[in-house]
Amino acid sequence: MAEDSESAASQQSLELDDQDTCGIDGDNEEETEHAKGSPGGDLGAKKKKKKQKRKKEKPNSGGTKSDSASDSQEIKIQPPSKNSTIPVQKLQDIQRAMELLSACQGPARNIDEAAKHRYQFWDTQPVPKLNEVITSHGAIEADKENVRQEPYSLPQGFMWDTLDLGNAEVLRELYTLLNENYVEDDDNMFRFDYSPEFLLWALRPPGWLLQWHCGVRVSSNKKLVGFISAIPANIRIYDSVKKMVEINFLCVHKKLRSKRVAPVLIREITRRVNLEGIFQAVYTAGVVLPKPVATCRYWHRSLNPRKLVEVKFSHLSRNMTLQRTMKLYRLPDATKTSGLRPMEPRDIKAVQELTNTYLKQFHLAPVMDEEEVAHWFLPQEHIIDTFVVENSSGKLTDFLSFYTLPSTVMHHPAHKSLKAAYSFYNIHTETPLLDLMSDALIIAKLKGFDVFNALDLMENKTFLEKLKFGIGDGNLQYYLYNWRCPGTESEKVGLVLQ
């Protein structure tokens, strides 16, 4: 969410390069990752060290071919000749662009890197500085009385389009954009594959607004090349409950990542949210920006070790054969918790009460009404699974949930997709959490998942190692826009974004 009154210079301070991921960043969008961090992982005993050196990408590499109209949008900056009659304003624009390109930095992956990083965009925003010591709670800026009415200007050759996801053709366009251009792991081996049905679930919860599905098209051929979304949520931050938005699915076509389309997307979604009287947001990123309220880590539990090794998602540990690895990760054929069954509509009220009561112990968590509980938890095939525990007297005491998010396996001759389950909300009052999550793994395995992923938030640290999860190789930072509060530990985070 960006400031209306940004100067021309700060409006251009967000730069994209041609790396293969994108998400919410301001000054380096290339590898920001949303709620799941990277789709890749490494489950070997010795964690593979990521190469620190950035790979240089060949021109026009990666992804699918764009059509000629899209390709023609490439920026080519050449110094003007002495006899040039280029207007002064144009020369200034070229000079500014060259300065920005020369100042381009790679994304900060940790606090040490972030301390040396220049955040030209975020320094203009109502977010805490990285070195700021915070002891207070509250909004950084007061709510605006006058919000800009006109959309922000896009670079020449592009146009705004509010996406009607109820239109199957438009939904398919968004699916294609994300499938071909969204978050990849550092080695460009896996890319999230959000299904059209999953996108409807994630982007149309209760209270969703059409204008918060914000797209960018090429003016000439109407090709969809950019997107950002907001959905409403009531979020409790320590003792304050605020109506805010969750920002997600910021994506720009690979071939357009030098056009400053993403910064305008961020500013435009801010404007559209502000018009509805909302001035706070929550978002996640795999890079360090000013200033994380919490940092979490992904863990991975192998369900199909053979496939994970074959696609290089994980690696055999030292002195481990594939057969021994498969035996290590073998699971029972049936769950053991008595009264465990799929959630039904009649369970909504009980699940709501369990959820809101349980989440009160955390510093950052949603507050859900019945309609939201129905939307987020009622089972939908290939999207969301929720299993409740009903005791002998008919009372619901616990539930587990996970959502489905496959990843496309790139450059593999046999395997094209990796089926991943992501831990969602797991609430327990009587069943030990370890038993509940053991059953979650068994259910996921029986449903054909290859891997089960979980963040180390809430009480998850109590079962991760015991259930043979392996630590992932990247962090996921949580951020608040226009809200200042002390940072918190991962185990005090009670919010999961898709």
Curated annotation (Swiss-Prot):
One of its GO terms (biological process) is N-terminal peptidyl-glycine N-myristoylation. It is found in: Cytoplasm; Membrane. The keyword Transferase applies. GO terms for cellular component: cytosol; membrane. Tetradecanoyl-CoA binds at H117, W122, L250, V252, S258, R260, V261, A262. It catalyses: N-terminal glycyl-[protein] + tetradecanoyl-CoA = N-tetradecanoylglycyl-[protein] + CoA + H(+); N-terminal glycyl-L-lysyl-[protein] + tetradecanoyl-CoA = N-terminal glycyl-(N(6)-tetradecanoyl)-L-lysyl-[protein] + CoA + H(+). InterPro entries: Acyl_CoA_acyltransferase (IPR016181), NMT (IPR000903), NMT_C (IPR022677), NMT_CS (IPR022678), NMT_N (IPR022676). Its EC number is 2.3.1.97. GO terms for molecular function: glycylpeptide N-tetradecanoyltransferase activity; peptidyl-lysine N6-myristoyltransferase activity. The modification Phosphoserine is found at S38. Belongs to the NMT family. This is Glycylpeptide N-tetradecanoyltransferase 2. It comes from Bos taurus. The gene is NMT2.
